[in-house]
Amino acid sequence: MKLTPEQQAVLDGSKGTVMAKVMKTLVMYGDAFGAEKMVPVTSTYGHTVISFGINAMKPVYDLYDQLIEAGAFSEQKFTADPLPLDKNVPSNPLQDLVFHQFMYKQQARYEAQLRKLGILSDKDYTCTCYLDEVGNKPKQGEVLSWAESSAVVYANSVLGARCNRNSGMIELMGSIAGCVPYFGFLTDDGRKADWIVEVRTTKKPEPQLLGSAIGMKVMEKVPYVKGLDQWIGTEINEDAIAYLKDFGAATASNGAVGLYHIEHLTPEAVQQGEALIRDGAPVYVIDDAELQRVRESYPCVWKDLNAKPKLCFMGCPHMTLHQLIDTTERVEASLRAHGQRKVCIPTVFTAAPGVIEAFEKTEYAPRLRNTGVVLSYICPLMYMNNPLSKAMPVITSSNKLRTYSTARYYTEDEIITMITKGAN
C-alpha cells in the first residue's frame, strides 16, 4: 500500500506507539482487501457500532483505555449504536440481575470511555444516526468510517455516501486516524450492480420480506432493483425513508448487502440508470409466491411453537418519527376495532433518543402511552441476548431481530392485530 508522507510518518511513530498501531491496523486491514492507498474520511461525524459494556469484551475496553491515555481521540465526533438497558422495558428481577451483574457490568465504564473518545452527546445512541432528528447524515460522495450494517447500507444506498462494511473498532480507528483503506464501496467499480432484481408482486411488498429475499439471494453483492418504484414512488420522502431503512436492514442481516440501487429512486440509480449494472448480471424475479416461499423458510426456535407471546418489539432498526406517528394511529384504530383499551401483549417501540424527544412534543406521545405501548431507546437485540430473554416467546416485525435472536417474525399488520386482539 502506498501511504502519503504524513500517513507513513504516523506508521513510523511520529505520533507515538499507540497511533502507530492504529495506522498499522488500518494498513493491514487494507492489505487484506487489496487496497493500494488510504483516502481521507470526509464526513462530518463518525459512528461506532459498539455501544454495550459486556464483560466478554473487557479486552476491547482495555484497548480503549490505551487510546485515551495516549490522547488518540477521534478526529471527528461520532454517534454510537443503541444502549442495552432501559428500566422501562418489561423484565423480571432475574433478567435484571443477569443484565446488570453479568452481561453489561462494564456499561458505565464504557460510556465514560466514549465520552472521552468523542461521542457527540449522551443522547446520541441509535442505529439510525442518519435521521434528521439525530443529525449524523452524510452527503453524497462523502467517505465514512462506520460499521453498523443497517446504517452503512442506508448511507451507501439512500444517501450516496461511500463506506465499506467495516468491523467494530476498525471503524473507530478510521475516525481516529482520519483515513480508511480505498477499496470496495469507496471505488466507482465497487458500486456497480452485480444482480438485477425484478419486483413483480401484485401489491406493495413488505420491506422486511423483500429485503430478506434479496439478501439471501445476492449475499454480499450489489443488487439493482427494478419495479419497486411503482410501489414506493420516485421521491425520497418520509414513507420511502422508513421503507428503505427496514428493507436495507433486512438485506444486510439476512444476507451481507452493503449497497443497493433502486431504479428511479436512489441517487446513483437516478443519475446513472442501467449503466450501473455489470455486463452479464443475473436476474432474480420476486413475485408473491417467492416472498411466501422465503417467509415459510424461516425457522421458529421457540420450545412451544404455539406459546402465547410474552413480549413484542417493533423498531429494529429504530423507528422514524413518521413510523411512530403512523403506528400509533394504527394501534389505536385496531384497539377500537377489537373493543380493547390497551395492548394485550407487552409491547415496546424503539427509536433514537432524538426521535423520541421530537415525538414527545406531538399529540401522539400521550396517545401511544394510553395504548399501553412502551417507547424506549434500547437495542432490542441487546435485550434478547439475555439467556432468560432467549427462552421467552417474543414476536417482532423486524427481520433483522428475527435473524439475530429467538424472536419470531410477523408482518406489521399481523403484529398490530396480535397486540390489540391477543394471539395464541
Residue ranges: model-predicted function:
Residues 1-424:
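Non-transmembrane, aqueous-exposed alpha-helical and coiled segments at domain scale
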